[in-house]
């Protein structure tokens, strides 16, 4: 193996970390609602007359739901509702027709709104986003450790980065996830066990993170809905140079240096290979750095980057029809949010033939 790859492995920051997230058991509706002046704290979607004002919490960069100028509801996704005496948390039964085509986003989100701040995705905005979790039991209660991100491409398959899998037992794919601190959602999450056999690309190199791609096969099909839909795969010849794309995840945030609870979104330009090689050569990787053919570069703008905990998350680019295509998968980087230091993504177009052949061979 060339010596520069040994150097590279010492400085590369893997975009995969672990954190504990709450159990995904749904609220049974029996909890009492918190009182507030003139009513009760209630989810916005259940309250027709609650007040919703934008306020930016300086330290957390979270958009809060407020009653007038005072925070009266402890949960930032609730408002003070004057007629909520008999209301309880409930899930929406979706009777509207759902478009099942790939790459269809919900630009305004579904029900919840995080207004005036593009740091966070709207609820249900990117239906293909998947949280990969590891299940365990503590005090006889099921809990989850966050492993990394993934992208839904088929009712039975999630594509992600190979490097996030330290172990392959008790893994769960969580669909429809948005706020890691909330169990209640307007549309129900679907948690589906992942088969123990993670399908890693045969040429994956864990030292240099070459061909850093894997398929996670679900033990049962996920059910598509408004908030759960697949992304489109690119054609093998597709290029995304200079296109502005979107990456999402629950990794470290730029302003807080803490894990995101609400799904963050980062708008990132795709960088042409020649420019990317030049930028990396000006870093501590040095002038002899060679950019592997499996890597796509994006970012390089200060304060806009994916970071620890985002490994396996997708980079989605809109095509001419407005549908989103999976251009990249978060793989590695030298630092987070630094000017002129791009992030390294798996170039998905190079692996489309392998993805399709693998799925067809199994099914």
Curated annotation (Swiss-Prot):
Residues 1-25 form the signal peptide. It comes from Anopheles gambiae (African malaria mosquito). The gene is CLIPA8. The keyword Disulfide bond applies. This is Inactive CLIP domain-containing serine protease A8. Glycans are attached at residues 49, 83, 117, 166, 319, 356. GO terms for molecular function: serine-type endopeptidase activity. The lineage of its organism: Eukaryota, Metazoa, Ecdysozoa, Arthropoda, Hexapoda. The clip domain consists of 35-55 residues which are 'knitted' together usually by 3 conserved disulfide bonds forming a clip-like compact structure. Residues 114-360 form the Peptidase S1 domain. Heterodimer of a light chain and a heavy chain; disulfide-linked.
């Amino acid at each position: 193996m060339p010596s520069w790859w040994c150097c590279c492995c010492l400085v590369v920051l893997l975009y995969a970390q672990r954190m504990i997230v709450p159990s995904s058991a749904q609220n049974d509706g029996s909890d009492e609602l918190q009182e507030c002046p003139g009513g009760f704290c209630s989810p916005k979607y259940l309250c027709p007359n609650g007040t919703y004002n934008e306020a930016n919490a300086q330290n957390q960069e979270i958009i809060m739901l407020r009653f007038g100028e005072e925070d009266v509801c402890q949960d930032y996704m609730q408002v003070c509702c004057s007629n909520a005496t008999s209301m309880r948390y409930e899930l929406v039964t979706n009777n509207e027709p759902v478009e099942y085509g790939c790459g269809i986003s919900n630009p305004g989100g579904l029900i919840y709104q995080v207004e005036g701040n593009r740091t966070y995705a709207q609820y249900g905005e990117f239906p293909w986003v998947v949280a990969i979790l590891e299940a365990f039991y503590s005090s006889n209660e099921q809990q989850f450790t966050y492993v990394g991100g993934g992208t839904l491409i088929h009712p039975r398959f999630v594509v992600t980065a190979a490097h996030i899998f330290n172990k392959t037992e008790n893994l769960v794919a969580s669909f429809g996830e948005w706020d890691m601190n909330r169990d209640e959602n307007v549309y129900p999450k679907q948690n589906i066990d992942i088969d123990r056999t993670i399908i890693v690309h045969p040429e994956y190199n864990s030292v240099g993170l070459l061909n850093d791609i894997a398929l996670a096969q679900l033990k049962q099909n996920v059910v598509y809905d408004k908030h759960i839909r697949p992304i489109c795969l690119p054609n093998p010849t597709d290029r995304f140079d200079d296109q502005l794309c979107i990456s999402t995840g629950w990794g470290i945030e730029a302003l807080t240096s803490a894990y995101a609870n609400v799904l963050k979104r980062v708008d990132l330009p795709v960088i042409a290979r020649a420019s990317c090689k030049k930028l990396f050569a000006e870093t501590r990787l040095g002038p002899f750095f060679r950019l592997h053919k499996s890597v796509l570069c994006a970012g390089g703008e200060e304060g806009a980057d994916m970071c620890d905990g985002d490994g396996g998350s997708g980079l989605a680019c809109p095509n001419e029809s407005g549908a989103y295509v999976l251009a990249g998968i978060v793989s590695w980087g030298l630092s987070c949010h630094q000017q002129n230091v791009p992030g390294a993504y798996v170039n998905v177009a190079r692996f489309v033939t392998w993805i399709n052949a693998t799925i067809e061979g199994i099914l």
